Amino acid sequence: MKNESLVKEPNILTFVTTYKCTSACNNCCFQCSPKRNLTLSREQMLDYIEQVTRDFPSVKVLVLTGGECTILKYLPEIIDVASHKYGLAVRIVSNAHWARTYDSARKKVAELKAAGLNEINFSTGDEHLEFVPIEYIKNAIIASVEEGFVPYVNVESIESHDFNSTYFTKDEELSTLLDENKFKVSNGIWIDLKNPEAMMKKPDKGIHCSNQRCDNIFSGLVITPDNRLKACCGITSGRVKYLDLGNPAKIPLHTLYDKQFDDFVKIWLHTDGALKILEFIAKYDKRIKIEEFEHLHQCLICTMILNSEKLLGIIKEHYDEVYANIIMKYNLI
């Protein structure tokens, strides 16, 4: 029987609205591209919003991402209903493909603002720039600021990449806006999802989050275009079957969400993080050298553990050694 005291209520609903994108980044976490058409319908999203606001009053934010959510003609309606009918703060994540000119950018941002949008985030970096020029991002930032937003720009980053957030400090117009706190920018972690072994051989010394606990899991409800509820929206979650909680079109969201609290591994990830779990596993698998993992992103370590029957088997066999301590720490978070 479930120990209901372990359940942590989510605060964010995320729709991966579509796998279709104007771009086809080589290491997209959901492998999106113009060739993929699977999309959450208007009716599906509205139904999920109604369910979530009824059954999860703790949820206050709706995030619309993809793929590229702005290609959906009914996006303004989804924003309008979520914002004005259900009182959710709504955020979108976009590659700004629509910001070819300042005027086109201003028109799009104004439309989204009128619908009830609260926050707008942009993604860029080496792979994004193959499809969306940095000038588009600049247009989108300026247009968003003019419409009263404080946009957030996430830059895919790794030591070997050419483009990073310093661009925004060197551009005269953008640096002024940045100094005035009119928009925000950060270097987001990038992972070579198609060749993770290469990252293990040459780890990025700029990564210092490997030893952190996972605060993504248990924080939200993530629904994908194929009607799957995910345990998190981490950058490798689309490649980890273990994090698939089920089909919310067939089983109520609350049932699927609550069931994950029967899983000690997920509780442990939330409490200690993937690296600490790997350190425990390494006691029983001497081939694992922890120093080789200290500069890998925690999502990559998590993926390695959750996709390995052998490593999960070690946890299953020995978890009772740490169970009481982890549950105590978990309840203090």
Residue ranges and their predicted role:
Residues 12, 218-220, 296-299:
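Extracellular structured ligand-interaction cores
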Residues 1-95, 99-110, 114, 119, ...:
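Conserved alpha-helical substructure of the radical SAM core
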Residues 9-16, 197-203, 279-292:
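Short, intrinsically disordered, charge-biased short linear motifs at domain edges
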Residues 21, 25-28, 214, 232, ...:
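Short cysteine clusters
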Residues 239-333:
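Flexible mid-to-C-terminal extensions adjoining Fe-S/redox cofactors in radical SAM and related proteins
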Residues 110-255, 259, 312:
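Radical SAM enzyme [4Fe-4S]-AdoMet core and its adjacent flexible, acidic
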Residues 15, 19-22, 208, 293-296:
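Processing junctions and N-termini across compartments
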